[in-house]
Amino acid sequence: MTNRIASFAAALACLAMLPAGAALAADHTVTISGFAFQPAAITIAAGDTITFVNEDGAPHTATADDGSFDTGRLDKGDSASVTVASAGAIDYKCNFHSSMKGTVTVQ
């Protein structure tokens, strides 16, 4: 019983050391299908990760207009993850198909 109380007290002490308001980064998925990003617009928090998954038969990229991320070539079944740290709106596109566009809004 004493070990349980000591373990509980140690766990509480560790929790107390965490910064107030600290949040865990979230993971988001954008699917590439039908020559479109789905969803085409996504809102995330700074530090979150976006995984782009290509479900099309054609190769695609997800390339930020401002150069902040680029998945490189994704063939069918491939995926790539990017983490965005700075707040703001980031437009991105597929380098192979100019009509494929999306926006990431980072808060």
Feature map (PLM): residue ranges:
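Extracytoplasmic copper-binding redox domains, predominantly the cupredoxin/blue-copper superfamily
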Residues: 2-8, 12-107
